[in-house]
Amino acid sequence: MLPMLLKHLSNRLMKIVSSFLQNYEAWRINTFALFFACGLMLTLVISACSTNNASNSTATPTGNQTATNQGVVVRIGYQKAATILSAMKAQQDLEKAFAASGASVTWAEFPSGPPMLEAMNAGSIDFGYTGESPPIFAQAAGNPLVYVAYDPWSPKAEAILVPKNSSIQSLADLKGKRVAVAKGSNTNYLLVKALEKGGVDYKDIKPAFLQPPDARAAFEGNNVDAWAIWDPYLAAAQAATGARTLTDATGLAPNRGYYLAAKSFVDKYPDALKTVLEQVKKRSDWAKNNPTEVAKFLSPELGIDAGVLEVAEKRRDYDVLPLTDEVISAQQQIADTFYKIKLIPKSVNISEIVWKG
């Protein structure tokens, strides 16, 4: 009896153990499968997210460009008489262009090119526009600036004036006379070339280095005998005083304008510089095709009659162009002339500071 009972219990125990082992193996396999499936799914999700992020990064490079201008302050120097930058300031062209990138714009007004480039040398502004002579004086003084584009302007847009009743009838008659001119300005070169044409040594005149407002007062008060000046001050003086034009720059000086930038700005923020030039080009194209509108805009800014300003606008040209070998060569000739007559202390190489961007 007992042996049979033990055999029955033994068989029963074996079945229980066998059942447990079978169930344990199934549980173990199922558990492994579950963890494997979860791991595979997590891997796929992570991979998909990584691919999506990489795709977005590649598809939106402008976001990176925007980040490069974030917090940048673009400081513009301008003259009221410099049509394009004055119009851009009034219309907030640059503020609108930089809004999405997070950059901001500030403006500083100057009476002429030389003090503007002095401010650039001092680190107060990043970008500006002048006639052909100021950057030469600035380079000779060690100013780290860069030519970034040029504007054709016009030789008709600058001249040497004499009072309508003056005894001066020719360029040779300027010998010994007192001539008002903004030192280092575009008309400084016109004066040099005009004297050369008239056979007069630069040392044989009495230059009165005056900014346009002071020069106008001196001219009207007969405190100077002649005045080398550019538009629109030229057109305004002709209309108000009946002054005679002794000569304009035709055949004497190209009278180009130059867009200039601080070298540090060019090196650190080339994308911001390109945005500035793009907006300058758009406003320049508008000015070229709308001289009457430009005159109406400038009139209250300058306190000059719109009709007078329209005369000035119609005898000049507009554009924003990269410097060519021809333009660089002409600018070098001006620099060499200034060095020859000791207006600048050392010779300079224009091509060394021309932007290649």
Features from the language model and the residues they span:
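Bacterial N-terminal signal peptides that target proteins for export
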Residues: L9-F36
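Pocket-lining segment of extracytoplasmic ligand-binding domains
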Residues: S133, P207-L298
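Secondary-structure end/capping motifs
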Residues: D267-L343
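Conserved C-terminal helix/tail region of periplasmic/extracytoplasmic solute-binding proteins
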Residues: D336-G357
